[in-house]
């Protein structure tokens, strides 16, 4: 694939088709419960209307249910006050409003909170809430897959083999369960402050390798009559699944974060093996094409600082050359160690020198403060299975 291949190139279309076909091999289980009821969480508006039609109800019932499920956050049909009791009973017989099970709940000394969510097939993922230390708001870091195929050398999740993709219900369910934990229902209106104010798709898995379910979940989250989180409050992070980046930009228009982490193919091939399929030139070209990128909506380049690997002044200068002309900022992430990791965090001096070179070129280069390290909730530390676990 050429570095300057246009988004409509037949090669990109073929690559997208292959990615979606592979995703189907790791499809999540159906939304049918063991007792035969269907989970309504994760259904689109159209699917919800179809479910109502199947039981002989009018389309407006779907609108009512949408409000109760995604705006009010109820999990019991009995709480739906504007629906007649006989219909509530009928709905309860046929359907459920699910949440993942909270299998573990850890609170860091810095108030970062990590939950292990277990699903009906007993698979599990970790989800993290990162509160803003200066304001009553914070980000929810969502997972998109159980495990990961990318095997990034510095990432704990990469040591957990991919089991399956998450469904739209399981992705949006993580956010809804976090809202349950913080009592943030009904959905705040307009500019009303939210504790859970942003979503970052930076948890376990590669979102663009589970694009259909991620996109469906984010469309539910962005619906103004439900959870109502605007697209500018959502950031999708990718390690560089180039063929899907154009589609995500066109269909979702959310903020883009790119896990770059190296400025030469020789280094990135080792620490981000996906680079062997989509190299740095192709990745940067896709960033230049990304719809809506502007000074107001900058692409974030994520760069984990690894001692002696990617943290030299020459690396910083090469980074500036690579992203020249792209509306961007660079998040510098001190490496967060995890059990069995072989890398070391760059020194404070090395990080400062690197940041200064990037900033002198006109790019913001904040150094991310590690959050939740004491509960293995920091960037690159998530993993839902431990060695020897069933």
From Swiss-Prot:
S-S pairs: 141-379
Record: residues binding S-adenosyl-L-methionine: 205-206, 237, 259-261, 336
Keywords from the UniProt entry: 4Fe-4S, Cytoplasm, Disulfide bond, Iron, Iron-sulfur, Metal-binding, Methyltransferase, rRNA processing, S-adenosyl-L-methionine, Transferase, tRNA processing
Keyword field contains Ribonucleoprotein: no
Class of the enzyme per the UniProt entry, highest EC level: transferase
The keyword Nucleotidyltransferase belongs to this UniProt entry's keyword annotation: no
InterPro entries membership: Aldolase_TIM, Methyltransferase_A, RlmN_N, RNA_MTrfase_RlmN, rRNA_lsu_MTrfase_RlmN/Cfr, rSAM
Cofactor(s), by name: [4Fe-4S] cluster
Residue numbers binding [4Fe-4S] cluster: 148, 152, 155
One protein family per Pfam: Radical_SAM
Major site of localization recorded for this protein: cytoplasm
One biological process term in Gene Ontology: rRNA base methylation
GO CC, one annotated term: cytoplasm
Gene3D superfamilies, A to Z: 1.10.150.530, Aldolase class I (3.20.20.70)
EC numbers, comma separated: 2.1.1.192
Domain of life: Bacteria
Compartment(s): Cytoplasm
Radical SAM core domain span: 134-374
GO MF annotations in UniProt: 4 iron, 4 sulfur cluster binding; metal ion binding; rRNA (adenine(2503)-C2-)-methyltransferase activity; rRNA binding; tRNA (adenine(37)-C2)-methyltransferase activity; tRNA binding
CC cofactor note: Binds 1 [4Fe-4S] cluster. The cluster is coordinated with 3 cysteines and an exchangeable S-adenosyl-L-methionine.
Function comment: Specifically methylates position 2 of adenine 2503 in 23S rRNA and position 2 of adenine 37 in tRNAs. m2A2503 modification seems to play a crucial role in the proofreading step occurring at the peptidyl transferase center and thus would serve to optimize ribosomal fidelity.
Record-stated family: Belongs to the radical SAM superfamily. RlmN family.
Name of this chain's protein: Dual-specificity RNA methyltransferase RlmN
């Amino acid at each position: 694939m050429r570095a300057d291949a246009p988004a409509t190139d037949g090669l990109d279309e073929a690559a997208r088709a292959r990615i979606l076909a592979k995703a189907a091999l790791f499809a999540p289980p159906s939304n049918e419960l063991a007792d035969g009821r269907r989970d309504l969480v994760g259904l689109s508006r159209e699917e919800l209307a179809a479910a109502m039609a199947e039981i002989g109800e009018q389309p407006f019932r779907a609108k009512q249910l949408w409000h109760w499920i995604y705006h009010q956050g109820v999990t019991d049909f009995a709480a739906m006050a504007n629906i007649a009791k006989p219909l509530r009973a009928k709905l309860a017989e046929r359907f459920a409003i699910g949440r993942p099970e909270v299998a573990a709940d850890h609170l860091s000394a810095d108030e970062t909170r990590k939950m292990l969510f277990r699903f009906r097939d007993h698979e599990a993922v970790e989800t993290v809430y990162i509160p803003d230390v200066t304001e009553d708001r914070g980000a929810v870091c969502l997972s998109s897959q159980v495990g990961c195929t990318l095997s990034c050398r510095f990432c704990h999740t990469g040591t957990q083999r991919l089991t399956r993709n998450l469904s739209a219900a399981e992705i949006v369910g993580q956010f809804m369960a976090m809202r349950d934990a913080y009592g943030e229902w009904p959905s705040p209106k307009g500019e009303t402050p939210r504790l859970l104010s942003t979503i970052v798709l930076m948890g376990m898995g590669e979102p663009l390798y589970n694009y259909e379910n991620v996109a469906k979940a984010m469309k539910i989250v962005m619906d103004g009559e439900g959870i109502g989180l605007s697209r500018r409050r959502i950031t999708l992070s990718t390690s560089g699944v180039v063929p899907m980046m154009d589609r995500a930009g066109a269909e979702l228009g959310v903020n883009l974060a790119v896990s770059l982490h190296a400025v030469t193919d020789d280094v990135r091939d080792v620490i981000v093996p996906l680079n062997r399929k989509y190299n740095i030139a192709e990745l940067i070209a896709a960033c230049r094409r990304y719809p809506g990128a502007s000074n107001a909506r900058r692409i974030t380049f994520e760069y984990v600082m690894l001692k002696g690997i990617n943290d030299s002044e020459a690396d910083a200068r090469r980074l500036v050359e690579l992203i020249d002309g792209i509306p961007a900022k660079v998040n510098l992430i001190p490496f967060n160690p995890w059990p069995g990791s072989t890398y070391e965090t760059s020194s404070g001096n090395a990080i400062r020198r690197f940041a200064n070179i990037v900033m002198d070129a006109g790019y913001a280069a904040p150094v991310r403060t590690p959050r939740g390290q004491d509960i293995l909730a920091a960037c690159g530390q998530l993993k839902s299975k431990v060695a020897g676990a069933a």
